[in-house]
Swiss-Prot record:
Species per Swiss-Prot/TrEMBL record: Mus musculus (Mouse)
Cysteine pairs bridged by disulfides in the record: C26-C37, C38-C51, C41-C59, C62-C77, C83-C103, C105-C119, C111-C116, C125-C143
Sequence ranges on the Extracellular membrane side: 20-193
SUPFAM superfamilies xrefs: TNF receptor-like
TNFR-Cys repeat residues: 25-60, 61-103, 104-144, 145-187
Cytoplasmic side of membrane: 216-289
Record protein name field: Tumor necrosis factor receptor superfamily member 5
Gene Ontology CC annotation, any one: CD40 receptor complex
Signal peptide: 1-19
Keywords: Cell membrane, Disulfide bond, Glycoprotein, Immunity, Membrane, Receptor, Repeat, Secreted, Signal, Transmembrane, Transmembrane helix
Length: 289
């Protein structure tokens, strides 16, 4: 009769032999099928039939619009990804038989996940905050509050905090202190303001006084083109005495016409023709016999 320890050892050897017979090791690019190691299909292809004792694994290339990125034994390839424009996506890299389509976001947006399934608008840094890191295709803008001595007065996707203006460097004084959103306001010192204001005021007063004198002079100056009345134009410097029998008629001009004196009435012009004047001149120059 077999003892119990021997029986246990016998069953252990039997189970070990059975287990070793079924434990077949395949390589990284193989898979176990019906006790045999079959080759996996390479990237860009799919499985059509498993291997047998007489034939190797049968694979077929992926169709257009499909891909397989790894060594596989799948009977179907994967569809290329579609970049949906309504979600703000665009194609960054076209897909191939071995790789999927790569999508990214449009300008001004970034992916909300690692797979870039959706997009979101870049977040601008509000006034009082500056840009620490600008947004990218996969990350949003990183903002930080402006420290003391710096400011940001606008919402921006790229502006950093700017330092306050140094009034001392410009020989000015601080009129208003700066904040995280506003710059320092500089101005002239009190003494300098007085030195500048006094000459300006004096210049304005002198200009006004000069204009006043000029207007006054122009108003008092008589007009050159003023027309005197007829009585003033005809008045002689000295009054003429009236004598009895004084003839005030204008002098009468006499001319010769055909060796006879001709009296020309006042206010009338001489009407002697050129031919008559030549005859008169020839008679006057003829010597007497």
């Amino acid at each position: 009769m077999v003892s119990l320890p021997r029986l246990c050892a016998l069953w252990g050897c039997l189970l070990t032999a059975v287990h070793l017979g079924q434990c077949v090791t395949c390589s990284d690019k193989q898979y176990l099928h019906d006790g045999q190691c079959c080759d996996l299909c390479q990237p860009g292809s799919r499985l059509t039939s498993h291997c047998t004792a007489l034939e190797k694994t049968q694979c077929h290339p992926c169709d257009s619009g499909e891909f397989s990125a790894q060594w596989n034994r799948e009977i179907r390839c994967h569809q290329h990804r579609h970049c949906e424009p309504n979600q703000g996506l665009r194609v960054k890299k076209e897909g191939t038989a071995e790789s999927d389509t790569v999508c990214t976001c449009k300008e001004g947006q970034h992916c909300t996940s690692k797979d870039c399934e959706a997009c979101a608008q870049h977040t601008p840094c509000i006034p009082g905050f500056g840009v620490m890191e600008m947004a990218t295709e996969t990350t949003d803008t990183v903002c930080h509050p402006c420290p003391v001595g710096f400011f940001s007065n606008q919402s921006s996707l790229f502006e950093k905090c700017y330092p306050w203006t140094s009034c001392e460097d410009k020989n000015l004084e601080v009129l208003q202190k700066g904040t995280s959103q506003t710059n320092v306001i500089c101005g002239l010192k009190s003494r300098m303001r007085a030195l500048l204001v006094i000459p300006v005021v004096m210049g304005i007063l002198i200009t006004i006084f000069g204009v006043f004198l000029y207007i006054k002079k122009v108003v008092k100056k008589p007009k050159d083109n003023e027309i005197l009345p007829p009585a003033a134009r005809r008045q002689d410097p000295q009054e003429m005495e009236d004598y009895p029998g004084h003839n005030t008629a204008a002098p009468v001009q006499e001319t010769l016409h055909g060796c006879q004196p001709v009296t020309q009435e006042d206010g009338k012009e001489s009407r002697i023709s050129v031919q008559e004047r030549q005859v008169t001149d020839s008679i006057a120059l003829r010597p007497l016999v």
